[in-house]
From Swiss-Prot:
Protein name stated in the entry: Large ribosomal subunit protein eL14
GO biological process assignments: ribosomal large subunit biogenesis; translation
Highest rank taxon of the organism: Archaea
GO molecular function, one term: structural constituent of ribosome
Keywords: Ribonucleoprotein, Ribosomal protein
Similarity comment: family membership: Belongs to the eukaryotic ribosomal protein eL14 family.
């Protein structure tokens, strides 16, 4: 299983957004990360418990705390869809 790290694509497995893909934008502490759908799906930029995420093998090369626009551009360059 891939580790939770900045730029990692993950699937939300709990809560109202379960089943949707997100990008880890920042690591807050050992239990929480900042995730975003980068405007490509309905997941807004928010804090999420790492226990509610299932990391995928895909990863985009972004800086820690990158904006949604930067993340969206990196996803398009990598050819990764969050649908």
């Amino acid at each position: 299983m891939p580790a939770i790290e900045v730029g990692r694509i993950a699937v939300v497995i709990a809560g109202r957004r379960a089943g949707q893909k997100v990008v880890v934008a920042d690591i807050i502490d050992k239990n929480f990360v900042l995730v975003t759908g980068a405007g490509l799906n309905k997941v807004k930029r928010r804090r999420m418990n790492v226990k509610h995420l299932e990391p995928l093998p895909e990863r985009v090369n972004i800086e820690r705390g990158a904006s949604d626009e930067e993340i969206k551009k990196a996803l398009e360059e990598a050819g990764i869809s969050l649908e």
